[in-house]
């Protein structure tokens, strides 16, 4: 009788281990390759959960495919960015902007930093991975600025027109207010130009890299 119980116990343990191995193989199966870099099913599942949490969205039958599509695009985009950053040896980024990103992300879902950490941990997600994700975007921004900063040209007439439009709605304008508004307009125009260069640079990379599903 004792031998029979031991045998049954052994069989149960064996099947549990087999199921665990099969599950691990499924999670680690490659579903997309971006150049030589793989993206696994587990990567996709984590990305889906992260998108749902950061957008404060509950996944259901109506939005499941849409969120999965966003997750796939996000993984591919980040992989391409990481590869380009690594290729160009980019390590610098704006530390203050990182703090701003963490703070704004937490506030967006009604939490502080500790609350954000907790909700990620409760969903088997890594806070450190989220920080790495932010760092990737900031390193990319730094890289784009360094590459294209000498190609940013602003139209003085357009800036002046936008300034006049803003001043029409301003009560009691003075030199300080006018200079501040003008600086805001110039910074906004520079940001638009950098975004344009960023999209162009990314599109060129995307076309040059083989992506297999």
Region spans (language model):
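Peptidyl-prolyl cis-trans isomerase
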Residues: 29, 38, 62-213
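Bacterial N-terminal signal peptides that target proteins for export
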Residues: 1-9
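Bacterial N-terminal signal peptides
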Residues: 9-16
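Boundary at the C-terminal end of the N-terminal hydrophobic targeting segment
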Residues: 23-25
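N-terminal targeting signals for Sec/Tat export/insertion, comprising classic cleavable signal peptides
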Residues: 30-63
